[in-house]
Amino acid sequence: TQVQEEELFKYLETHDKQLLLMIKFVSYNFLRPIEVCRLQIKDINFEERQLVVDAKNQLQKTKIIPELLFKEIEHLKGTNPNYFLFAPQGVESWETNESNKRDYWTKRFKKVKEVFGMGSEYGIYSFRHTFITKLYRQLRKTLTPHETKSQLMLITGHTTFTALDKYLRDIDTELPADYSNLILQASR
């Protein structure tokens, strides 16, 4: 829920700012946790506010960094380009494989989930679903479904309408209006 999300962000702001920043990369840049784990300083173009990401389905993709996220990392300009954005003690080198990195962050988030009594169905990846859903619903307030999906594709990095449609269906982005009248009419 919106309240739960706000409480969780507030808790992380006090107790684990680094984990919060990781979640913001997933939430605001619509990255997968494994993609966030790969990020190094050299992947950030500070002048253009862009990020080069080693993605799931293509070698690399370039994404803009939204202003509300960029403000939190602009101080890193000039840091060792080979440092990872997300290492156990902050921005530094981290010599281990990607699976270990993702597992580390998953376990770190698990401790926060325990504080909030959240079940195993919630993970860092859930924030990607949540924020894509929020963005979709916000865009739908003023755009047609097709226009919404066109805009969303640019933001999320989905490369085809088919892939985006499947993703949106899988996370129940659009719910129908109450259809009680249809049931009543069909029952006559």
What function would you assign to each model-found segment?
Residues V26-E48:
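Short, charged phosphate-coordinating catalytic segments
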Residues D43-E48, K141-L168:
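Short, polar N-cap/turn motifs at the start of nucleic acid-interacting alpha helices
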Residues V91-S93, N181-R188:
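C-terminal secondary-structure termini that scaffold catalytic or DNA-interacting sites
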Residues Y11-E13, I34, E47-K71, G78-T79, ...:
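Basic, Lys/Arg-rich DNA-contacting stretches centered on the C-terminal catalytic core
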Residues E13-T14, T79-P81, T106-L154:
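Short, basic (Lys/Arg/His-rich) helix/loop patches that form interaction surfaces
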Residues P66-G119, Q138:
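Active-site/catalytic core of tyrosine-dependent DNA strand-transfer enzymes
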Residues Q2-P33:
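Basic, Lys/Arg- and aromatic-enriched nucleic-acid-binding interface segment
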Residues K56-Q58, T156-L182:
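Catalytic-site neighborhood detector that most strongly recognizes the C-terminal catalytic loop/helix
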